[in-house]
Curated annotation (Swiss-Prot):
It comes from the Bacteria. Its EC number is 1.14.13.127. Pathway: Aromatic compound metabolism; 3-phenylpropanoate degradation. Its cofactor is FAD. GO terms for molecular function: 3-(3-hydroxyphenyl)propionate hydroxylase activity; FAD binding. FAD binds at residues 8-37, 275-285. PANTHER family: 3-(3-HYDROXY-PHENYL)PROPIONATE/3-HYDROXYCINNAMIC ACID HYDROXYLASE (PTHR43476), FAD-BINDING MONOOXYGENASE (PTHR43476:SF3). Catalyzes the insertion of one atom of molecular oxygen into position 2 of the phenyl ring of 3-(3-hydroxyphenyl)propionate (3-HPP) and hydroxycinnamic acid (3HCI). This is 3-(3-hydroxy-phenyl)propionate/3-hydroxycinnamic acid hydroxylase. Gene3D superfamilies: 3.30.70.2450, FAD/NAD(P)-binding domain. InterPro entries: 3-HPP/3HCI_hydroxylase, FAD-bd, FAD/NAD-bd_sf, PheA/TfdB_FAD_monoxygenase. Belongs to the PheA/TfdB FAD monooxygenase family. GO terms for biological process: 3-(3-hydroxy)phenylpropionate catabolic process; 3-phenylpropionate catabolic process.
Length: 562
């Protein structure tokens, strides 16, 4: 085996998290090597739901237009009781982050687009059919020993990220715990081609006799999931006749369905004791496992990649100190834990097999649906934990105000610029830091010293205005992009907060916010908390990709203002 020599980052695992992370790093000029034990991508669906945050991440790496054809946007999820009476419905209407909150998707096709995206980068490589054997850390980095069909090899890197799944070898070598529970309940998942039902949405049957799920994906694929009883074996659950009987209540001719795959699985609720140990980090299923009920296993992994990617790139390129990577665990652990707890709780609500318990549950849910605020809480998925970082790579004013937007994701409305109408905001912000002011010039507010330092870090400077002022050119600054508030969403945001100057991280989290006059102090605080340095690059090739896209037109999911 030819040794790949030295790279900046080694990623173990070519699943969706590893591929997304590699695209983020590749776009920032970071030399990256993926080591994958399999010979090719997995060709069957695992995850079936994408949320708005994942699509926003794919937008940031320039691949969302390639991915959208493999999705079903605005997918409704309905919950039924044993008599097929509607208990609850999830149909979130807003797209505050630029994309629908619920989307069905075909994972193998999306993963293939993520892999194809790496072809854009000469400095990113995937080694298939190679197993990571050992990791040795020293003062300068890590040495990864790899085995394969043509012999061993070693590669030296600054960091290793384990994206190698629930049985992560990276986590094992780190000596990190993976505490939690594994459910004793088993389920069989059946993926069908040529969808025998054909309708576009999904349902969960909270039937105590046998809870089930029926999920429309894309390209004519439907997934059924059924609970397996204690007296039924795994072998039974994979028998074609047994599967046909499971499908019979839903499909007129279950013996004629086109089965792509069927398998038995259990639900895990686990989280790693640490997401970082020295120069080794974990992401995705290697860091956390959760039940399927909120469709957040896949999406939580993509959040990991987006959170970690920009930080790794900044450290490798010498723009930030190594301590920035400590904020990855501080930020992602709490949110991943909240998602695990929510998914576990929803599973318990859906799957009681005791009829009296199920009847009581049905009464409680129907009673709650009478109350408009509770009904909207479910309909609009307001129960979904949103990232809100109280510590990490964020600066909170002291004392912090309850309404402060710091540590939350910034909205992504459609905006106008002098050059282009009706574009998603992130396509104007670029892929790095951004300083965004309402109705002010960022250079004037920051002062020349802070402005110059942010500019050296590749930041984009945005002056947001009402659309009526878009083409007012007095005091124009060539380093500042003027954005017209096409929909009024930006004005509404700033109207709801006292802060009028925002510093946005590359993952679009609000790193800091304050009133206009305190912008210089805000910058000084953030340079310290984010461990940002002047200068940098340290051998990385530098940012090489920025692909603004007319994305929402192709999705048809975000309303266009005329």
């Amino acid at each position: 085996m030819n040794s790949p020599g030295a790279v900046d980052v080694v990623i173990v695992g070519a699943g969706p998290v590893g591929l997304t992370l590699a695209n983020i790093l590749g776009g920032q000029g970071v030399r990256t090597l993926i080591i994958e034990e399999r010979e090719t991508l997995i060709d069957y669906p695992r995850g079936v739901g994408l949320d708005d945050e994942s699509l926003r991440t794919f937008q940031s790496i320039g691949l969302v237009d390639a991915i959208l054809p493999h999705t079903v946007p605005n997918q409704i999820l309905r919950f039924y009781d044993a008599n097929r009476r509607l208990l609850a419905e999830m149909a979130p209407p807003d797209a505050r982050f630029g994309w629908p909150k619920r989307n069905g998707f075909v994972q193998p096709m999306v993963d293939a687009e993520l892999l194809a995206g790496l072809d854009r980068f000469d400095h990113v490589e995937v080694m298939w059919g190679r197993r990571m054997q050992t990791i040795a850390e020293d003062a300068d980095g890590v040495t990864v020993e790899v085995s394969g069909p043509d012999g061993p090899a070693s590669v030296h890197a600054q960091y290793v990220v384990g994206c190698d799944g629930g049985r992560s070898a990276t986590r094992h070598l780190m000596g990190v715990s993976f505490d939690g529970t594994t459910s004793s309940t088993r389920w069989v998942v059946i993926d069908l081609a040529n969808d025998p039902l054909g309708h576009p949405n999904s349902e969960v049957g909270a039937d105590p006799q046998r809870p089930y799920a029926s999920i429309s994906i894309a390209h004519g694929i439907r997934r059924f999931e059924f609970m397996i009883h204690a007296d039924e074996t795994d072998e039974q659950a994979e028998d074609p006749e047994f599967v046909a009987e499971l499908l019979r209540p839903f499909v007129p001719h279950p013996d004629r369905v086109d089965v792509i795959r069927r398998r038995v699985y259990t639900h895990h609720s686990r989280i790693a004791g640490s997401f970082r140990k020295g120069r080794m980090l974990l992401a995705g299923d290697a860091a956390h496992l959760m039940p399927v009920w909120q469709g957040q296993g896949y999406n939580s992994g993509i959040r990991d990649a987006f959170n970690l990617g920009w930080k790794l790139a900044a450290v490798v390129r010498g723009q930030a100190g190594d301590a920035l990577l400590d904020t990855y665990d501080a930020e992602r652990r709490k949110h991943a834990r909240a998602m695990i707890d929510l998914s576990t709780m929803v599973g318990r609500v859906i799957s009681p097999t005791n009829r009296k318990v199920a009847a009581l549950r049905d009464k409680l849910i129907r009673g709650a649906s009478i109350v408009p605020t509770l009904k909207r809480y479910v309909l609009e998925m307001r129960f979904k934990p949103m990232p809100r970082y109280h510590e990490g790579a964020v600066y909170h004013a002291k004392p912090p105000t309850p309404a402060s937007p710091v540590g939350t994701l910034f909205i992504q409305p459609r905006v106008d610029t002098r050059e282009q109408d009706n574009v998603l905001l992130d396509d104007v912000l670029g892929t790095g830091f951004a300083v965004l002011c309402w109705n002010n010039n960022p250079r004037t507010l920051l002062g020349e010293a802070a402005f110059t330092r942010w500019k050296a870090l590749g930041a984009t400077f945005i002056a947001a205005r009402p659309s009526t002022q878009l083409h007012w050119t007095k005091d124009d600054d060539p380093d500042v992009v003027i954005v017209g508030d096409r929909t009024g969403a930006l004005k509404a945001f700033f109207d709801a907060h006292t802060e009028s100057v925002l510093v946005l991280r590359p993952d679009r989290c609000i790193a800091g916010a304050d009133i206009a006059q305190r912008a210089p102090e805000l910058s000084t605080a953030l340079f310290g908390i984010l461990h940002l340095r002047q200068g940098g690059e340290n051998g990385a090739t530098g940012p090489v990709l920025y692909v603004p896209q007319p994305t929402a037109e192709s999705s048809g999911t975000v309303g266009r203002a005329s």
